[in-house]
């Protein structure tokens, strides 16, 4: 008895058919190539779990993300796949335990025959059996253990996939809202440009009626107006496509999306295209880019090794590799003998010839099965499992490289956008000075209205470039959070987008003199 009790854990634990899994060696850079402040991995927080998008301070993003997290088919599929993997892991764990079943049967039979001297003899018999049965596979070679490990690895992979789907969804919504805000501002610029060109065409036609210009001048003005209207139509289509994208992601109606995104995040609507009392057409009032596009707070990353290995896509690929490694052990164990403990306890009831009898039977033992000849199928299964593991390792290496590239691209984009913001603001200020000077010259009769309107268009275009740079900076910030898998550090003293907007409540109003 003592020997049996000592042997039982060994039988349950089994003999390993291969070494324990070790994560493949992954090459990562010692530091980020683009300039970024690195912090210890312990100081980074998982912003993916902390509603990172709220750091932008954009109510439209907050509302659409909240709707998408409860009603997005892609995310729902990822969660369903995670639940499937959890169920499969439960099945694999259950297979390592004894399987107990209840077996029973009821039969009634009649037999008849001819007996010498007594004629025909008919006998009716009724019988019933009922009892439990037990079957328990001894995991001698770790087949069941490796099967459970493979299922656990896939559960971890699907969990990471769900986290990646959630991060990707929230990032797509934030990116689309930023693009839609910039698109609306760009559309307003084109509306004002069309209004200016319509006035120019009217003036040209009036001058043509007095013989002051050649017919080619109104024709050129009409051509420019048609081109501007075509550009506006294309911009309207681009804005509509972004709205459709947000509808598909968040499940909200297009009208709701437009209502949410039309005002600026700071609550100030874009200036209307109304006429000015001092000139035929007023330029778009100066609007600070931070009032149209949220100014994201600064963030820091851990070193590449810590950041990349915690990325959900990398985690999913690594856990899939672990599952494939375990399946090699399963394939090896399938070629070895298998021992099952079986037991049966049956109660029997029989009635025949008017008498009834009942009795119990039991049996216990072990069943041995082993492949003798399979035509090489077992060896082929092992080679296939090994090839699938190598494929998973290469997928893991690719996931690390892709994540590193995405982080570096986002860092480069953020730096470029930050520099363009500075230069575009200088361009806006210079264009404003030129516009005000030309307005004064136009009132004094020193320049024509066409020269004035050209300076207006330059000012509007400079503002549009500033908004585009602010959009690119915010998009790069979103891309950086996504590329880092949400594992970033945000200084406690760093202001959020809403803090910056609330500190300048009057920005976005006209600042003309």
Where are these regions (language model features)?
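Small/polar (Gly/Ser/Thr/Ala-rich) solvent-exposed segments
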Residues: 76, 96-124, 135-164, 183, ...
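Terminal intrinsically disordered/low-complexity segments used for targeting and assembly
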Residues: 1-70, 152, 236-309, 349-350, ...
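A short glycine-centered flexible hinge/capping loop motif at secondary-structure junctions
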Residues: 208-212, 442-446, 483-487
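Alpha-helical heptad-repeat coiled-coil segments that mediate oligomerization/polymerization in large
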Residues: 211-214, 403, 410, 445-448
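Hydrophobic, lipid-facing positions within transmembrane beta-strands of outer-membrane proteins
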Residues: 128-134, 176, 303, 362-366
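Periplasmic alpha-helical coiled-coil/stalk elements that build and connect Gram-negative outer-membrane
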Residues: 144, 153, 160-303, 413, ...
């Amino acid at each position: 008895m003592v020997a049996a009790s000592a042997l039982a854990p060994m039988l349950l634990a089994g003999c390993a058919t291969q070494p324990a899994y070790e994560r493949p060696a992954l090459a990562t850079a010692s530091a980020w190539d683009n300039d970024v402040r690195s912090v210890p991995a312990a100081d980074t927080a998982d912003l993916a779990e902390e509603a990172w998008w709220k750091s932008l301070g954009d109510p439209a993003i907050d509302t659409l993300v909240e709707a998408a997290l409860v009603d997005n088919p892609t995310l729902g599929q990822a969660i369903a796949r995670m639940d499937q993997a959890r169920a499969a892991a439960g099945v694999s764990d259950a297979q390592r335990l004894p399987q107990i079943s209840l077996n029973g049967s009821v039969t009634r039979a009649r037999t008849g025959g001819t007996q010498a001297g007594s004629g025909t003899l008919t006998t009716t018999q009724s019988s019933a059996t009922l009892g439990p049965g037990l079957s328990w596979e001894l995991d001698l070679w770790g087949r069941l253990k490796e099967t459970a490990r493979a299922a656990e690895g896939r559960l971890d992979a699907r969990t990471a996939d769900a986290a990646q789907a959630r991060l990707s969804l929230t990032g797509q919504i934030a990116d689309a809202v930023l693009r839609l805000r910039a698109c609306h501002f760009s559309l307003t610029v084109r509306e004002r440009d069309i209004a200016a060109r319509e006035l120019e065409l009217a003036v040209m036609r009036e001058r043509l009626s007095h013989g002051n210009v050649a017919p080619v001048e109104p024709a050129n003005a009409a051509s420019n107006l048609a081109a501007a209207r075509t550009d506006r139509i294309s911009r309207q289509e681009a804005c509509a496509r972004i709205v459709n994208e947000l509808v598909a992601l968040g499940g909200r109606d297009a009208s709701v999306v437009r209502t949410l995104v039309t005002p600026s995040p700071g609550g100030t609507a874009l200036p209307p295209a109304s006429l000015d009392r001092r000139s035929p057409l007023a330029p778009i009032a100066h609007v600070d880019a931070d009032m149209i596009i949220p100014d994201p707070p600064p963030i820091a990353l851990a070193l590449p090794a810590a950041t990349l290995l915690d990325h959900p896509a990398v985690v999913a690929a690594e856990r899939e590799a672990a599952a494939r490694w375990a399946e090699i052990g399963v394939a090896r164990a399938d070629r070895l003998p298998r021992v099952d403990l079986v037991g049966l306890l049956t109660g029997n009831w029989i009635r025949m010839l008017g008498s009834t009898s009942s009795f119990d039977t039991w049996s216990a033992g072990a069943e041995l099965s082993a492949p003798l000849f399979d035509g090489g199928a077992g060896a082929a299964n092992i080679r296939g499992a090994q090839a699938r593991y190598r494929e998973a390792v290469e997928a893991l290496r690719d996931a690390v490289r892709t994540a590193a590239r995405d982080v570096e691209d986002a860092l480069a984009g953020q730096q470029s956008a930050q520099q363009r913001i500075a230069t575009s603001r200088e361009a806006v200020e210079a264009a404003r000075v030129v516009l005000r000077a030309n307005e004064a010259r136009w009132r004094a009769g020193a320049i024509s209205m066409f020269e004035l309107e050209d300076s207006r268009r330059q000012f509007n275009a400079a503002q549009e470039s500033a908004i585009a740079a602010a959009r690119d900076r915010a998009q790069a910030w979103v891309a950086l959070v996504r590329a880092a898998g949400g594992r970033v550090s945000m200084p406690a003293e760093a202001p959020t987008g809403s803090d910056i907007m609330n500190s300048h409540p009057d920005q976005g109003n006209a600042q003309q003199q």
